Amino acid sequence: NIDPKKLMPHVKNTIERGKKVMASDYAKALAQLSEYRFKVDQIFSKFDYIISPTVAIPPHKCNERPNIIDGKIDISEISDHEMFNENNYDYSSWIFVLAQFTAPFNWSGNPAVSLPCGFTKSGLPIGLQLAGKKRSELSLFQASKAFEEIKPWHQNRPNI
């Protein structure tokens, strides 16, 4: 048993939202997930890897949602979608913004790895994601190793 008073607000919010999911909606989501996985498999029939940033924005302080990106862009300017409205903000929506490059492979079941590939102007690490075909973990590790041999960012550490 978990004491609800010890949970962070975003965890409580996620639990409450989960309680409202109907079985029929869950079944529909599973069917959509199956279709999605099929489409991702089709993409990987043409490509060995997909390369992307690991996350969509530079790192920010733990437990804080950045309002400004790189000192210039107000987060509200990214989209007028209601999930970005400050009054309607919830943690799961913000996590989706952060995980927009990683979530697709979490859903599809494809292996992916995040590799260090540089630092922000303020010295925080930036990640590059390399995703592969299902059951291609060995090939993905080999490609990751080759990248790290060419660009040994993994040997650098941010100043703390």
Q: Which residues make up each language-model segment?
A:
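A short acidic, glycine-rich active-site loop
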Residues: 72-99
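Structural helix-boundary/capping segments
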Residues: 27, 38, 92-97, 101, ...
